[in-house]
Amino acid sequence: GLETGDKKTVIKHYRGTELQNYFNFLYGKHEPRIVIKPQYIESVRSVVKGTVEKCLKEINGSLDQLQTIINLLSLDEIMGKSVDILSGGELQRFAIAATLVQEADIYMFDEPSSFLDVKQRVNMAKCIREVLLPKERYVIVVEHDISILDYLSDYICCLYGQPGVYGIVSAPFTCGEGINNYLDGFIPTDNTRFRSEAIDYKIALCKDEFKGSLGKIEEGMDGDEKVVDIIRDYISYPLLRKTYPTISITVEPGQIRSSEIVCLVGKNALGKTSFIKMLCGKVEPDSGIKVPVLNVSYKPQIIEPTYKGTVEQLLYGKIPDAMSNSQFKSDVLKPMNISHIFDNLVSTLSGGEIQRVAIVLALGKPADIYLLDEPSCYLDVEQRLVAARAIKRFIVNSHKYCFVVEHDFIMSTYLADKVVVFEGLEDEKESSRVNSRATSPMEFVSGFNAFLKSLDITFRRSKFSMRPRINKQDSLRDREQKREGKYFITDDISEPIKSFVENSIEW
């Protein structure tokens, strides 16, 4: 082709295609205005000053549109807050709102679901569609939560290539076709296979009952009650309570088996992270129960690396035994593809690379119980499944215990053996306080069913890839499932396919 070309040549080259209209628009008399919601929102705190309400009104004075966005994103409770003290989920919703209120020709949203819970993710998708579609503007979204991408998109472009080397963008496909092509790892229009294996989402089926006696409970120091009492093949924790100025958290007593993963699900700000911190001794419960007797490895939600050296130096310095263990290399290190960034400085890593290193560090630390807070954050679709497999394989093979906080519903269903559901109600005596209650660990289907019922959202499973899909609000399928009380349908993978799933999972 031509090595150089002017705007007229470009338009002529794409004559007769959909791109001709786009380039006519792009190279028109008026330069198009583009607004972007960035991937990394942490820097917003240092750039934007003032309360949420003040900042949004300064960006755009259109109060009618602003009120619609406030309602859809549930921003009422944070309008008086200063931007620099917002939590991750609050900051994400503010950044989305700040993008939506602006007048532009092209809107771009880079990972708008990060730090949002399932309900907020669905509302975010509704908000983008309801606010921008009537304007007939270009809207581009980069998103790694497949269920939200499915709910939000009209068309999908698949990106594939070699990270840090090159990338290829496919032609647009309809939403379902695009997602299926990406999961298959094959672009039929280009006759190109970019992944050797298809991505399958399989339910984390409950493992066989552990056999044998429970053994003896090991007493803590001085006979005092501990957060965790060790039983052979089990750990149990008592009733836990923690009160903050705006929330009161009550966790029902529970029990978890070795080689089992319990997912903590619920809306943001209901105490899931506080529960994890109580288990690992970083927060003391109101009842005065002492710190756990177990060794704990904790991967926090927000990762702020301060290490000055390379990734290799960090890993061999922090987890030398794991780095020389062949089983750990096979189960975790190799699948997470860490060797490719060994020579990179930790300070230069991207969000996804930092997350992968943090997961490896957490799993590599010698511990009895592993607590992972949002391990999917900043990971792409394929990396999320790889991380879920690595976590699952490590916990099963090492016979450890694991709690995971995760808002990506697909990743949650892949990881979970049991589910703890967090629900919150406004305090009748004090309206500014929320009473949060967490259930004991529930079975997979009943747990997710209770969780989705609290959100008034229904999911079904794709017959082919088995990935969970959100039903459109008030659709026929949505109404039928709610009427039957089945908010999470697994009928598509009942007995015939269940045996296939069990036989196809290799640990």
Give the positions of each predicted feature.
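ABC ATPase nucleotide-binding domain signature region
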Residues: 1-62, 145-176, 255-269, 273-325, ...
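Conserved ABC ATPase signature
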Residues: 82-86, 345-349, 353
